[in-house]
Amino acid sequence: MDQAMEDSKILKSLQSNSAPCTDTLGAYVTKFSSKPPEIEMEFQAIKDFTHSDGQVVQGGFVTGMLDAPMAHLLMGLFNFEIIPMTLDINVSFLAPSRQGKLVAVAEVLQLGKSTAFMTSKLYQKDLLVASSTSTVKLVKLN
């Protein structure tokens, strides 16, 4: 099977198997590539995620929107045979995130046998609103 077909199969699996936490964030995987390793996810920020009279999405939700694509990218790259466990995440909030659609793009910075170094960027209407780096432990499923 060629790489494009394999990536398409992984994308469909990511789209059809979601966790309650990503469902809460209104997450949907729109792109997956193993070479180069990259994923794109859309999120729907609702009023319940906001503070300041509905004006700004709370930082914890933004962090979740940055963390989820990094984990999903690793799950896809390892054919769902690992559990990605975030060891640390560093987030830079660059502009207010508002209600509505946000798009995250995650990439691998470096991949080892048991640890991955990741990066993720969150956009709203082509404006970079937040970015992150993360160290992730790769735990094999039994």
Question: What is the meaning of each model-derived region?
Answer:
Residues 1-142:
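Terminal targeting signals and extreme-terminal segments of soluble enzymes
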